[in-house]
Amino acid sequence: MKKFILSTLVLALSLSMAAQQPQPLPIDSAVRVGKLDNGLTYYIRHNEYPKQRAEFHIAQAVGAILEEDHQNGLAHFLEHMAFNGTEHFAGKGIIEYFESIGVNFGGNINAYTSLDETVYRLSEVPTVREGIIDSALLVMHDWACGLLLLEDEIDAERGVIREEWRTGAQANRRMWKAINPLKYPGSQYAKRDVIGDTAVINNFTYDALRDYYKKWYGPDNQAIIVVGDIDVDQIEQKIKALWADVPARANRGERPLYSVDDNAEPIVAIVRDKEAQYTRIEMEFKKPQLPKQFRCTDMAYVQSLALDLVCEMFNNRLSELSMKPEATFVGAGSYYGELVKEKDAFVAIYLAKQGQEVAAYKDLLTQLEKMRRYGFTTSELERVKKECLAAYEKAYNERGTVRNINRAQECIRHYLDDSPIPGEEWEYQMVQQILPMLGVDMLNQIAQNLVTDENLIISFQAPEDKSVVLPTEAEAVEMLAAVKNEEIEAPVEEAIRENLVETAPKAGKIKKTNYIESLGATEWTLSNGVRVVVKPTTFKQDEILFYAFSQGGYSLVATADLPSAALATDVVELGGLADMSATDLQKALTGKRVSVSPSISAYNESVSGSSTIKDLETMLQLNYLYFTAPRRDEESYQTLISILNSQLANRDKNPKVAFSDSVQMMQTDHSDRTIIFNKAMLDKASLDKALEVYKARFANPADFTFFFVGNVDPNDEVFQTQVRTWLGGLKTNKKLEKAADDKVRVAMGIQKNYFTRQMETKTASNRIQYTSYDMPYTLANDLNMEMIGRILSTRYLESIREREGGSYGVGCAAWMNRHPVPYAQLIMQFDTDPEKQEKLMNIIHEEVMTIVENGPLAKDLNKEKESMLKDFQEDLEKNSYWKSVLSIYYKNGINYITDYKAAVENITAESVQATLKKLVEAGNMFEVVMLP
């Protein structure tokens, strides 16, 4: 909410609303905010989504920007050390205790460091026992002021940080780091990048880390946030007691706030990288921030809303431009927000098409000048006002079912950024008052003030390739000046179509009703053969999720047609529906909170969607059109091909592409049905074949099962009428399909593909995969496979990350699939120092064989069972989970609601050992390793 005073009109509007004086915004009465004498701030809120769970966060208003040169990277290093020994939790004690009650490291126990903040969290902590709550608060206390920073733990973590640096050392990060000194000369923001310097990481003295900790970690820079199913009064007293003896941070200096200098003339910054895959053109118009005392006032709120509307109108223009084949970019957007702690910016970005970099820059200049010169039309403004009001209305309707973690994030942003937290009721009422007062002339004046020559930074990040031509610094400035004298067509008013379907189809009937008691779901069979399943919930007051599936997918598509099939749903979504282009359709949906999207996968076709209660019929109409009226649009197809050609032009510059392609070829044993989307495959695609495939896959709605989950009542007559009309009115036939066995299998036997690639950062990328086709698809087998992946993840965390410091992390997962035939699969993937590759690969297999020979450790098995059961309990309060439960029930005949808990409880060390042994003894294992 840190905005500058844009115009006297906006200021006058703000003041008129506030009796000639900017008024502070209220804080939601459900949030208790307090501050202790030592400077510690706290936020406490009772919230029951999910029930019997709570969020415990500590926000530190310090980050990498505060490091000295010899501490470069140590703010982030310190964050890691918070999990390696504290006053009350020795060693890995925090992780060990909370994982024993189902709170997982990584997912629920985590932290992040940025330039200006460091935030730690314990998420979805059970509140069923007071001892757990006390332990969580004790962790907050230790993270605030009780880190041990033992020398052996510091040394052990150096390797982990090195590997995190290696994992992130890719083209985009290198260019970001290289361009900041050019954009922000002399600023602290030009010097710091969070991950830091490996020379510092490898060699810093222990006291360098301790000095940063002692200087900046203190109660005046910290806020404790507790949100969930807790007693607010009790938590407040516990916080006061725990922090009673924590001293204020005295004689260590105020936390400085750094900025970036103003510039009278444009700054032009250009960097290139050998592995970059696209050109990013960015224009930053720096603006002074609103003074701190005004940031949480009604004046700031009005200005923020006005700026959001302006950016949204500009983005709508860019979106419409992107639908044209002659568009010079593959992606574009703008936003207004905090650039650094003491400066805001309006930022506009183009991702240029290959070979059109100069044209893209000129077009960006033209669009900005068009906004500056003419502003926007009344119809453009009315569109974004409708969207804005619909968003606030949905938030208001769902104010009673906001999840704990989202409420915690609101408090964190209030503390760190002065973001307001007045509550959805206040905001919805206020926005309804403000929007009518924001006229097009006022917003056009704001738009004009956004685009200026002073305080402008123009930057280009591009591939190091002779075919990528960029303007020089001088040419970039010349083009900026020239655009002001060019003729630019003014925008024109447009009428917005509102009806998606002019004539509704003849409604069908509900011929059969079946209630599935175990799922609390109602199943209808309609007169046209369509099957509908309705699951009412109360988890979200204004959310309805929609999903439909049918068997078939790519497995029923001829091999020669797969390139076109891969584009089929993109072609339809970009082509529009019925007589509406995609742009017309987008405008017709203005102000509606609805989405529908078709998809085709290897063995299924599906439609997914969501809507508010009042937009449910619109969602059904969109689904109706996706089945009945996909639109052939040559122009949109050429737009798609142009975008894809540009995206693929530099695809192979990234060595990770060679690695992922190699993995995919192993997964399919070099089948000619392998879809690796490259230029050669794109050249084989055609518009007509793509539409033919789409129409074939969605030819018979009676072959689909349609699901509705959310705030929907199957007994509601209006809902029944909508379903009978838009689903029951679909034309169907008697043809029912099953997915075919496309004969695609993983490479059999023991296979190894080791190869080298040129790369900027020397990295060994590794993929290991075990597959068995000898295991039937059952819930027990699937959960034993999942358990194997979970337990091995823990083993690799301890052996490869913590003991060896060899990798930032090993991605590990295991599961079962039904198609094309039942099979079980275990994958492990990681990056490491090439010098350590062989040793770590051996550890990967050793951990597997240890379980095969001895079974899993009891502590690993028990904590993962606890975690799975805890996750299950939490998932039962999510609409998305129920949608998944229903689809699995109808696809695979497995009832998670009745069977999952018992199946998890029945997992034993013996069942895990036997399952993994069977997987390994199948004898199908491949390794893909890419070396520099």
Question: Which ranges hold each PLM region?
Answer:
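Flexible helix-coil linker/hinge segments at domain or subdomain boundaries
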Residues: L150, A248-R252, Y374-L381, D633, ...
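Active-site His/Glu-centered metal-binding helix of metallohydrolases
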Residues: L74-A82, V310, A568
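M16 family metallopeptidases and their MPP-like homologs
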Residues: R45, P50-E67, L74-A75, K92-D142, ...
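Positively charged n-region of N-terminal signal peptides that target proteins for export
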Residues: M1-F4
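Hydrophobic h-region of N-terminal signal peptides that target proteins for export
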Residues: V10-A18
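Hydrophobic, small-residue-rich alpha-helical packing segments that form membrane-like cores
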Residues: E153-A208, Y212-N221, I225-V227, V232-K240, ...
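Proteolytic maturation boundary segments
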Residues: A19-T41, D231-C296, A300-L305, V310-N315, ...
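Internal metal/ion-chelating core segments
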Residues: V200-I239, S671-I676, M681-D713, T721-V723
